[in-house]
Curated annotation (Swiss-Prot):
Self-association and partners: Homodimer.
Role this protein plays: Catalyzes the hydrolysis of N-succinyl-L,L-diaminopimelic acid (SDAP), forming succinate and LL-2,6-diaminopimelate (DAP), an intermediate involved in the bacterial biosynthesis of lysine and meso-diaminopimelic acid, an essential component of bacterial cell walls.
Cited SUPFAM superfamilies: Bacterial exopeptidase dimerisation domain, Zn-dependent exopeptidases
Residues that, per the record, bind Zn(2+) 1: 76, 107, 169
Biological classification of the source: Bacteria, Pseudomonadati, Pseudomonadota, Alphaproteobacteria, Acetobacterales
Reaction catalysis annotation: N-succinyl-(2S,6S)-2,6-diaminopimelate + H2O = (2S,6S)-2,6-diaminopimelate + succinate
Species whose genome carries this gene: Gluconobacter oxydans (strain 621H) (Gluconobacter suboxydans)
Catalytic class of the enzyme: hydrolase
CDD domains: M20_DapE_proteobac
Name listed for the protein in its UniProt record: Succinyl-diaminopimelate desuccinylase
UniProt cofactor(s): Zn(2+); Co(2+)
């Protein structure tokens, strides 16, 4: 393979990916396109559909080399629906001025293109000293049941886990180089259904008001300060998101009440411990209550070490900024990867992600490519 065949231009690849209408759960040809590019660079590729046989979730894993250090780039090709009112066709990959427009350019087809271009530039210098892989899912913007989680489990079963993973989420709020994510809070939702006895409001002694029991339980839950934060995390937060009784009458005590809450928790807690606490409080106020808990991810932290330092130095060398190490924001697929290897997140500027006219500056695509290349070189590849 000659150097001229390597896809070193991130803009060209990003535009090709943007033209694939991969609104989750559809793929739109994005992963086949990417697989073809990677195979042309010498990667071994695996198409890994998971989920229902009639509508499987597309996933792509590609690896070049077998040695160590073993670096993985994780990302996704699915995008959220574009909505209405765009100035340009959201799948036309229009360049206007110094910006590239398209659904998913920031989150995160642009990041995928930059990493591929960085690997291409590294290969122009000679063979890798270790191995590089890509884990690309089509189920990040959806339920995330059949994407990164089963793929990383598949890698573990094969004994093919990386030493370190970079997730290319758009971590930067305003400018490239703002933030590297080294952890994320855990997230859990609880649905509490309290059953009472329906009755007339004039005869409360003949009824059992479930709303009062639910409010008492939620008052105790919200009164507790979960923690004051930890070294890398802000304080955990419990928020009541709804209380529903379905009662349109003014003179009826309802027979049941349903409350919902969410907890974003730091590394001082586990989902299991918080679940036990919620159940204990609720059942003291409403012994017959039904509590259903869904934990979408545990809190995790990658302690700053050699790899994170190397990534930070790569960012600084290209942008002149020293990125802030951060754990804020919502959940990401890093919650699945962190159970198997160290992971940090760094990608493009996310100011327009999920918005109408999503776009990035063309220069940031080149700069992110240079950052990924500098990181690979510093990491020993």
């Amino acid at each position: 393979m000659t150097g001229s065949t390597f896809p070193t231009d991130p803009v060209a690849l990003a535009r090709d990916l943007l033209r694939c209408q991969s609104v989750t759960p559809a793929d739109g040809g994005a992963q086949a396109l990417l697989a073809g590019v990677l195979e042309g660079m010498g990667f071994e590729t695996f198409h890994l559909p998971f989920g229902p046989a009639d509508v499987p979730t597309p996933n792509l894993y590609a690896r070049l080399g077998k040695g160590h250090p073993a670096l993985c780039f994780a990302g996704h090709t699915d995008v959220v629906p574009p909505g209405e009112g765009w100035a340009h066709d959201p799948f036309a990959a229009v360049i206007e001025g110094d910006r590239l427009y398209g659904r998913g350019i920031a989150d995160m087809k642009g990041g995928v293109a930059c990493f591929v271009a960085a690997v291409a530039r590294r290969l122009e210098q000679g063979p890798l000293k270790g191995s590089v892989s890509l884990l690309i899912t089509g189920d990040e913007e959806g339920p995330a049941h059949f994407g990164t989680k089963p793929v990383i489990e598949w890698l573990a079963e094969r004994g093919e886990l990386p030493d370190f993973c970079v997730l290319g989420e758009p971590t930067n709020p305003q400018a490239l180089g703002d933030v590297i994510k080294i952890g994320r809070r855990g997230s859990m939702n609880a649905v509490v259904t309290v059953h009472g006895t329906q009755g007339h409001v004039a005869y409360p002694h003949l009824a059992d008001n479930p709303v009062h029991r639910l409010l008492a339980a939620f008052s105790e839950l919200t009164a507790r300060e979960l923690d004051a934060g930890s070294e890398w995390f802000d304080p955990s937060s419990l928020q009541v998101t709804s209380i529903d009784v379905g009662n349109g009458a003014t003179n009826i005590i309802p027979g049941s009440a349903v409350g919902r809450l969410n907890i974003r928790f730091n590394d001082l807690h586990t989902g299991a411990a918080l679940t036990a606490w919620i159940e204990d409080v609720v059942r003291r106020h409403a012994p017959q209550a039904d509590v259903q808990v869904s934990i979408s991810g545990e809190a995790f932290l990658t302690q700053p070490g050699d790899a994170v330092t190397c990534l930070s130095e790569a960012v600084r060398s290209v942008t002149g900024r020293t990125p802030r190490l951060d754990t804020g924001g919502g959940t990401s697929d890093a919650r699945f990867i962190s159970q198997y290897c160290e992971v940090a997140e760094f990608g493009l500027v996310g100011a327009t992600m999920h918005k109408r006219d999503e776009n990035v500056e063309l220069g940031t695509l080149e700069d992110l490519t240079r950052i990924y290349l500098a990181f690979m070189e510093g990491y020993g590849l």
